[in-house]
Amino acid sequence: MQADLFDAEQTGIRTRLGEQAWVLRGFALPWLDALLPALRAVIAQAPLRHMATPGGFTMSVALTNCGALGWTTDAHGYRYRPDDPQTGLPWPPMPQAFAQLTREAAAQAGFAGFDPDACLVNRYAPGARMSLHQDKNERDFGAPIVSVSLGLPAMFLFGGARRDERPARIPLLHGDVAVWGGVDRLRYHGVMPLAEGQHPLLGRQRINFTLRRAGA
């Protein structure tokens, strides 16, 4: 209950991360009744899995996808593909609630008209992390990235144009939506190891889904 109250108190606040980068505090909270069932349906159709990087490391974050294109990694590299490599079937359709929330969040951050075609769903268990990286597998860097946080709080790292630039640390709470694009589109970013905890709705996990325009 205390976590829910704190999340609610943050709703409507905008935290600026850069010239064209924002965190919209609590923006996803009014959408939860639609988001959570849709999320469960996506995971039921395309289960979460731990993928291996080209270097042979298994990612600590479990992931899946929905939408026309899904992000994957294996020994051959990072790429988007229209089908689930485990089944050969198309990824689940992007839920309408995901797409509409994304369009509205993007517009609030100055990116009206954003139309995502790819949604990467990440599940962080305690201890899972995401190393600093750039999102460079998309064909068009003109579209923003919209990232929705649900469940346990995480410490988001938002760096600069080079990996060696010291990143800012920004807490992301249940319902927060981060949006970055334009001059900030290729900034390095990551997530520190998730702290142990128990969220009243989602338990011992953080769910993050990130929407992009990956195709032409």
Where in the sequence are the language-model features?
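Non-heme Fe(II) oxygenase metal-center motifs and adjacent flexible, charged/small-residue loops
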Residues: 1-216
